[in-house]
Amino acid sequence: MIQMQTNLDVADNSGARRVMCIKVLGGSKRRYATVGDIIVVSVKEAIPRGKVKKGDVMKAVVVRVAKDIRRADGSVIRFDRNAAVLVNNQSEPVGTRIFGPVPRELRAKNHMKIISLAPEVL
């Protein structure tokens, strides 16, 4: 569960290393985001010569959350850290590679490009 002020790792090669959620998109009273949701983030830490720089405000798709994700078959999946992938206004990834596993819940939210770039889908 991601809310405002939550720090996330960046799971792509866009140049950002850490981002902070500044808004959860999807309604004025929406408080939490989970896997597959789009949030607005501020880049807090970036590498030199990356596509993004510190202070940039961008959209991101949440790909990993530390909170349990319940599935219809009763199984539960959770990750060690919160992570996101930076996207542009058309919801296409800014980076060209995705690092680490992503859950298959992204498929239901139509983030097929992220699914295809990911090395492992859980």
UniProtKB/Swiss-Prot annotation:
Q: Which Pfam families match?
A: Ribosomal_L14 (PF00238)
GO cellular component terms listed in the entry, alphabetical order: cytosolic large ribosomal subunit
Q: Which UniProt keywords apply?
A: Ribonucleoprotein, Ribosomal protein, RNA-binding, rRNA-binding
Q: From the Swiss-Prot or TrEMBL record, what is one GO molecular function term? A: structural constituent of ribosome
Biological process, per Gene Ontology:
translation
Query: Which InterPro entries does the UniProt entry name for this protein?
Result: Ribosomal_uL14, Ribosomal_uL14_bac-type, Ribosomal_uL14_CS, Ribosomal_uL14_sf
Assembly and partners are described as: Part of the 50S ribosomal subunit. Forms a cluster with proteins L3 and L19. In the 70S ribosome, L14 and L19 interact and together make contacts with the 16S rRNA in bridges B5 and B8.
Protein name per its UniProtKB record: Large ribosomal subunit protein uL14
Upper classification of the source organism reads: Bacteria, Pseudomonadati, Pseudomonadota, Alphaproteobacteria, Hyphomicrobiales
- Gene expressing this chain: rplN
